[in-house]
């Protein structure tokens, strides 16, 4: 699609309508709490990637990609899993970082490496695909924070995510009339089950006592996790020729992008309002946890400028809800913005092109995103890889020593 045809006013109205519906007000953390959480979670997540197994498995992955992932995911975890104990936050951050670092590996045809997957799994043999090699090592570390039902859902969702990426690498948008396909694929790869599983640690939630409530969250959570992301991604993905929920709807249902945006907005509002309404007279800690996730999720999207909402903010041709959109944007930035220098390590070799940018610019456009601006023209030889990882390790070690004093 041509960005010149982007329905900016309609999109502005959609964001405002959604934020009005959930009564957006992120009071999860103070600024100092965000900084402390980001420093701890990021340093420990970065440290994981200096360990022997991930270094071996990821030897061909550019270090700046790993650095970008660890920054993004640390930011995501601290803002959305804000009520999780710190060590559980670290292990969830590592879990999602592995997924994002290896996304390209899943998106290349995995059939050969997966040929003996189930036999190897049942017989306890070494897996062949790098995704599962790393997860076989990390999952026990993650699951120790959770009881059996939440652990089961984390595992289920991990399998679902891999399958969703396997399907997506074919860039198949579904046949006309296959109306179940778009949401089927979106549920597979949205990681809703992992969110619901990891957000209720055994230390804070009695799984047996709250089994019905947790089961209900498992059923409802895919909508908030997937659709909020799709709504905030609508602008940046408008001119990209990629299969996603919105373009898949257009393909299978024969609707326009404007109609798809209206559907997406309505469904996002319904999903978020419904889960909060269901929980409002249930366990108060569970309600606070889900509300905190949704509101933190909004803050994270607005503070991650890869979603390019600043471009909407700066447009001079907006009417209607533009003033309220800007108010919400300013509120989220005031609550959630933390300059990258306050919490993350600087790693040799991760420079960006052009003049030396300020930390906010680095965070916004280069290092704090799920889509990575890696300079693929530059060869990543072993000296470069080694020195970059060593620099990261030295920074992390120094930081942890300082914390232990």
Curated annotation (Swiss-Prot):
Enzyme Commission number(s) from the entry: 4.2.3.-
BP GO annotations: sesquiterpenoid biosynthetic process
Motif (NSE motif): 227-237
Domain of life: Eukaryota
Family listed: Belongs to the trichodiene synthase family.
UniProt free text on domains: The conserved active-site motif D(D/E)XX(D/E) is required for coordinating the divalent metal ions that stabilize the PPI moiety of the substrate.
Functional summary from the UniProt entry: Terpene cyclase; part of the gene cluster that mediates the biosynthesis of the sesquiterpenoid aspterric acid (AA), an inhibitor of dihydroxy-acid dehydratase (DHAD) effective as an herbicide. PbrA cyclizes farnesyl diphosphate (FPP) to produce (-)-daucane. The cytochrome P450 monooxygenase pbrBB then converts (-)-daucane into the alpha-epoxy carboxylate intermediate which is further converted into the tricyclic aspterric acid by the cytochrome P450 monooxygenase pbrC.
Protein name (record): Terpene cyclase pbrA
Species in which this protein is naturally found: Penicillium brasilianum
High-level lineage: Eukaryota, Fungi, Dikarya, Ascomycota, Pezizomycotina
Originating gene: pbrA
